Amino acid sequence: MKIKFKQSNIKVAIASAIMVGSVSFSSAGYAATLTVNAVIGEACVIDASTTMSFSGYNATTTHAAGNGGVNLVKSANIGSLCNAGTTALINMNKGLNGAGADAAPTRKLAISGAAADAPKLNYNLYKDDGYNFVFGIGGSGGVTDAGGLSLVADGNSNNVTVYGSIPKGQLVPTGTYTDTINVTITY
């Protein structure tokens, strides 16, 4: 069987095929948004690696009891870094040899390795340079506790000055007296 095509029909078919092949489809566009957020929580770090060194205590002269003697005073800095806006509280414990109430502990320096009943050197740590406000322990550990030192962070490193005092007139044996204080920051 022989099929005959008219030349004009072939031309129309070719032109139609070219047209169909060159037809373009427009793509549909959709837009959406992506929300990006970050939640920054309260966070702090503390650096209490400094040493408060009471050197030169002499209870028979400079630091003698009575009107002529004075307490031996020193200071040290504790560094803290908290996210901006964080409310924090710095507290200190009584130390290894401390006694007294949490709000106003009596801290004691002792000769390392000495018997438990060996003489100790009383001292304390204060929040102010007038030596009026003892650095308490902060019983509940909350950020509003009166025993510690409260701060609202600005995002920068902060130094908190701790003031120490050894009361005058303590006649104790010679030696190197030490104590270890745990410093905490609660936020």
Residue ranges, per PLM feature:
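Bacterial Sec-dependent N-terminal signal peptides
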Residues: 1-15
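N-terminal signal peptide c-region/cleavage motif recognized by signal peptidases
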Residues: 21-26
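N-terminal small/polar-rich segments of proteins
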Residues: 30-117, 150-187
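Predominantly extracellular/luminal cell-surface or secreted proteins
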Residues: 93-95, 124-128, 136-138
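Solvent-exposed strand-loop boundary residues in beta-sheet-rich modules
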Residues: 129-131, 187
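Extracellular beta-sheet repeat scaffolds used for adhesion and glycan interaction
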Residues: 131-155
